[in-house]
Every structure is written in structure tokens, then in C-alpha cells.
């Protein structure tokens, strides 16, 4: 998650010229159908059943709280997710949670259970390999919210343990860390060179344990260059400069755009920075020889309340627009909504309010919006292609 959207860069991010922007606009048939629907009063459900796109691999939910719930609740929530078209769940394989007691001790039970629950519902799993126990943390970070590994080799050993344990059971997708360009996830502050060293070591170890695995670089947040956090585009370019090419199969990205909608160009918007600004995530990938690789949106959403809240209607609109937009972009491999259920009701905590459901389990308008979009895809059986780790 990110705290604000005003993501600056070391140099100005310029808007791509109109002829290039045309490549990102919705297909004419979608626009025509939407206009017709508004004029005729036809529901959006009908409109979007007419548009089918087969190349997007996966729609999922990023749900860090699912692992904390009972097996019964997990089964119930996963069934509800699947009923609205969700086919995958993104979960933390938290090193600090599994090996908190030392390098020879493993507390696998909670992670084992949630992976079992997902597979029992026929859902694929994206495991985020992250976290760091105090005994393996870099000096001075062990007491931080997100301590960072002291040794890439030790982190790689952890990554190999995760891959060796879960790949034989069907997990094929591993994401290396979460938002490493944010101080909230990388202490004492983001360090592209240190992250890249961990990524390279983890990639090699995962591929030895599971050669067919899809390894995604840690989802980058559209932060500002404020002396602490690093803008996602700049961070990605620094990763390439530090030798990251060849050590990931896809780029992880979190294109949050609120309070704007995804299709509204804003130079600070994570969605716009994906490929509309100059430079952008895609332009950096292309200039470094990785145009053939995909971007995986491993988080996207908007808070319905709290200090950065956009309201329930705008939250629903943002998710609808993100899903529809992603289906029109060939280089997006998958999209994960953040998140299933509000984590609380704190008026001062924006993170509490991203759910499709309230903290009490009542569906918000965003639930219906996602259900409509993904239900349409499900009925065509074309929008969600292979489940790589089923």
C-alpha cells in the first residue's frame, strides 16, 4: 500500500504525445458500446459481455489478512471470491513469521493452511517472499516494522525453502518483496542496489528449486522522490543499472491512482506512470531490452473512507476502470485487487478502507462492480486464461 499519490521524479515526467496516447485508449468498440448503453439505458453487464480479450492471465485478490483467519473462514471467503470471478489470491510468505525463532526452526502451519484452502477452491496462489526475522536482519533494522535482510545469500536460502515447499503442490508464482521503494517496507530507507542483490540471489535459488516458476519483481508503489521514498520509475531504472535484468520474469507494479480514476491522466498517478508518462514503467523496461516481459499489477484499489478516502462510488468506479483498462493492454499479465475486506474502521487510517466488503462483511458498491466485471469474463471463459500454478 502507499500513503499518497504525488509521485515525483528526479526529472520531470512528461506526458506522452497524443499519437502515442492513442495506443492506450480503450478500443473503439468498447467506447461505442458504453455510449449506446448510456443512451439506451442498457446495463453495463450487457455491454461488457460483448468485449472479450483472451490474453490476461489472472484476476486475483491481494489479501494479507486471510492467513490470520481460521480454515473455516478462509474456505468461506475464498468461495465468495471465486463466486465473483476471482481465480487467484496473493499471500505473504513472511520469513519473519515462519523463522522468527531461528534459522533451524520453521513455523509453516499458518501458511500451509491458507495455501491448502486456496487450492481446495481451485484458486492459484501468488506468494510474496518477504519479511525478515530479527536474527537475519541488517544491523539497526531488526526492531523496525519491515527489517531488511543482512545477507542476500540468507534471503535466497529462504526463497528456495518457500519454492521447494510449495512449487510441488502447485504454486508457480513468486513475488520478491512488496513495495521495496517505500520506507514502510524497506528499512532504514529504500535502496535499489540492496534490493537488486536480494532479487538476483532469490531468483537464482527459486529457479533451481522450481525452474518453471514465474518470478515477479517486488510490486513498486508510485511514490514521490522525497528523500526517503523513491519513485517507482526511478527505482526500476536503478534496478536495471544495478544488474537486475535477467533476474525476474515480470515486473510487479501497484498503479494506484486515487483520488483520480485510472483513465484520467495525471503525472503523479501510478496508472499514468505505467506507460503514459515519460519516462514510464514500460519505457524503462523497453529501453533495457525487456519489452517482451509483462507487468503484473499485484495491487490496485482505492480507500472508500479514511483520510485519503474517495467515497464508495468512486472506489467502485476506480476498480471497474482498472479491470476494463487492464483487459485492453497486452503486456499486463494479471491484476490483483487490494483487498477483500476492510481491515478496520479507524477514521485516521487509510489502510483500513480498501476492501470490497466492510469490516463487518457487508458488500460495498466496489464488490458489485468487481463481480460484474469478472463475472462477464467468467461467462466468456476467455478473459482468464491459464491458471499457471493450479
Regions found by a protein language model. Give the residues of each.
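Hydrophobic alpha-helical membrane-insertion segments, chiefly the h-region
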Residues: 37-47
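Aromatic-rich peripheral "rim/lid" segments of glycoside hydrolase catalytic domains that contact
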Residues: 107, 180, 307-321, 325, ...
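Short, acidic/polar
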Residues: 68-82, 154-163, 229-241, 316-323
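Hydrophobic faces of well-ordered beta-strands that scaffold small-molecule active sites
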Residues: 57-63, 89-91, 125-129, 172-176, ...
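N-terminal Sec-pathway targeting helices
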Residues: 21-36
Amino acid at each position: 500500500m502507499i500513503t499518497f499519490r504525488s509521485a515525483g521524479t528526479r526529472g520531470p515526467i512528461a506526458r506522452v504525445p497524443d499519437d502515442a496516447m492513442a495506443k492506450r485508449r480503450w478500443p473503439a468498440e468498447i467506447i461505442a458500446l458504453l455510449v449506446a448503453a448510456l443512451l439506451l439505458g442498457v446495463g453495463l453487464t450487457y455491454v461488457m459481455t460483448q468485449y472479450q480479450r483472451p490474453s490476461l492471465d489472472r484476476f486475483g485478490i491481494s489479501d494479507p489478512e486471510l492467513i490470520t483467519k481460521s480454515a473455516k473462514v478462509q474456505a468461506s471467503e475464498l468461495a465468495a471470491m471465486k463466486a465473483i470471478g476471482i481465480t487467484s489470491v496473493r499471500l505473504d510468505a513472511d520469513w519473519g513469521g515462519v523463522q522468527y525463532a531461528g534459522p533451524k526452526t520453521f513455523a509453516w502451519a499458518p501458511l500451509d493452511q491458507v495455501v491448502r484452502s486456496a487450492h481446495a477452491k481451485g484458486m492459484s496462489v501468488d506468494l510474496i517472499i518477504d519479511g525478515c526475522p530479527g536474527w537475519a536482519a541488517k544491523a539497526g533494522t531488526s526492531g523496525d516494522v519491515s527489517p531488511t535482510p543482512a545477507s542476500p545469500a540468507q534471503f535466497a536460502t529462504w526463497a528456495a525453502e518457500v519454492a521447494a515447499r510449495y512449487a510441488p503442490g502447485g504454486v508457480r508464482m513468486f513475488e520478491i518483496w512488496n513495495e521495496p521503494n517505500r520506507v514502510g517496507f524497506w528499512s532504514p530507507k529504500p535502496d535499489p542496489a540492496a534490493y537488486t542483490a536480494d532479487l538476483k540471489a532469490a531468483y537464482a535459488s527459486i529457479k533451481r528449486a522450481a525452474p518453471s516458476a514465474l518470478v515477479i519483481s517486488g510490486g513498486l508503489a508510485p511514490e514521490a522522490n522525497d528523500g526517503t521514498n523513491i519513485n517507482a520509475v526511478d527505482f526500476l531504472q536503478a534496478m536495471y543499472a544495478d544488474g537486475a535484468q535477467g533476474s525476474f520474469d515480470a515486473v510487479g507494479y501497484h498503479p494506484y491512482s486515487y483520488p483520480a480514476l485510472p483513465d484520467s491522466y495525471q503525472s503523479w498517478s501510478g496508472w499514468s506512470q505505467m506507460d503514459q508518462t515519460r519516462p514510464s514503467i514500460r519505457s524503462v523496461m523497453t529501453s533495457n531490452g525487456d519489452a517482451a516481459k509483462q507487468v503484473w499489477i499485484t495491487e490496485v484499489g482505492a480507500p472508500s473512507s479514511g483520510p485519503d478516502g474517495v467515497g464508495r462510488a468512486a472506489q467502485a468506479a476506480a476498480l471497474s476502470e482498472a479491470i476494463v483498462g487492464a483487459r485492453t493492454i497486452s503486456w499486463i499479465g494479471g491484476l490483483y485487487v487490494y483487498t477483500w475486506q476492510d481491515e478496520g474502521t479507524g477514521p485516521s487510517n487509510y489502510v483500513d478502507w480498501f476492501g470490497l466488503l466492510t469490516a463487518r462483511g457487508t458488500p460495498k458498491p466496489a464488490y458489485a462492480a468487481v463481480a460484474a466485471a469478472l463475472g462477464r469474463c467468467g461467462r466468456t471463459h476467455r478473459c482468464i486464461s491459464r491458471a499457471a500454478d493450479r
